[in-house]
């Protein structure tokens, strides 16, 4: 019986403590009704700890780990802190079995995950807004945001990498081939009752159906329809004339109008199905170029699509070893041989590849080499960010070189050297693709810059004209100004010359006066000294 419950929400982790488990364990109708009342349920279940998520990224990281049964560091520390005092007697109820096992292994806490625990968690979920004191609208927003980000991380895929379209297309194409073959045979037998010679002249099934639709009743066929017959037979005039002559001398019986209409309806349906098959073939080729260009270049669109369909997906095919790819499609023969202890098959679907089917000798060795190259090509297609068919072309050339080696003994290039050359070519191509848009942008910028420069030049020319007019008027003014300045300067110079001698005269007169004053002061001092000496003598 669980004593505590670990509950995860979009906002964080919560731990609840349970009490009175005897009544809850019964889960009668009365107990279930009381569980719906929060006041009663809160007496039995109390929240003892909570760990809110710090951000949306933190919430997504924790939820991703919990969904895989991994114990995160934050949850580890939270549980350790909550049950730090006592772990004995604690039984933690956890919703996920894997998570409960990882908690028990790391923290040595006994965990429980059963129907009783899930019922209690359901009741907690019903009252979580009251426990956390959060509004139900806020909880719903958090759940929506986390749910969208979680699903986005799980359902992350590239639209061009949808190999399911290839699987469905090749299955439908194979079925169409079988059905169309049956329908063409039925049309031949049906229309041959009326015109049996046409079956011997025309070998192509599509041409036979189109001619049957054109001719209808052989009695109405004339030479006027020769051009139309030539158009159907791709401008083969001799065959067209043979059809005309055979219609005139035909041994077939007459056919009623009702029977002829029925045959023509069936011919229309067969022709439309053949057109749909050609469109589907083109669609498959385009999809193979988008999803597995190297595999398509190595073995062709249809064989590559068959391999992907047999493996289940491109990723599954990329994970297969070369030995499994070699016998893919020959599982029945393989298990039959293993049961009887006979020889195992050397090839499966890849037998239809031109490299294997065209050779009479060394088919097993060529199939082994081709399966090795297929496994390399599928891994490049599956895990490369920039799809390119150059690796597939190089691998196909390696298979051709290996066939030459088996037949003539000419040593092929090393795989390492070939791959280095291809990688250099691919890097050059991507560098050129990155440079092209930059060149376009710079040219557009130059064009934009050139347009305003032309406007600026026109504006400048207008300004220069105005400035030239102004400069002429300024020159006239400048010529007049120096004359005025010369007159002013002459007046100033004459006044200065007159002022200078006056200043010199004043200076000389002031010097003379100073000398006279000094002489007088010296005389006065001498007289005072003499008078002072006389006074001293008289006192004595």
From Swiss-Prot:
Entry keyword Metal-binding: no
Pfam families: Nop (PF01798), NOP5NT (PF08156)
Localisation: Nucleus, Nucleolus
Location (main, coarse): nucleus
Sorted UniProt keywords: Nucleus, Ribosome biogenesis
InterPro entries: Nop56/Nop58, NOP58/56_N, Nop_C, Nop_dom, Nop_dom_sf, NOSIC
One of the GO biological process terms: rRNA processing
GO molecular function terms attached to this record: snoRNA binding
Protein role: Probably involved in the early to middle stages of 60S ribosomal subunit biogenesis. As a component of box C/D small nucleolar ribonucleoprotein (snoRNP) complexes could function in methylation of ribosomal RNAs (rRNAs).
Family: Belongs to the NOP5/NOP56 family.
Protein name, as recorded: Nucleolar protein 56
Originating species: Dictyostelium discoideum (Social amoeba)
Species classification: Eukaryota, Amoebozoa, Evosea, Eumycetozoa, Dictyostelia
Gene name for this UniProt entry: nop56
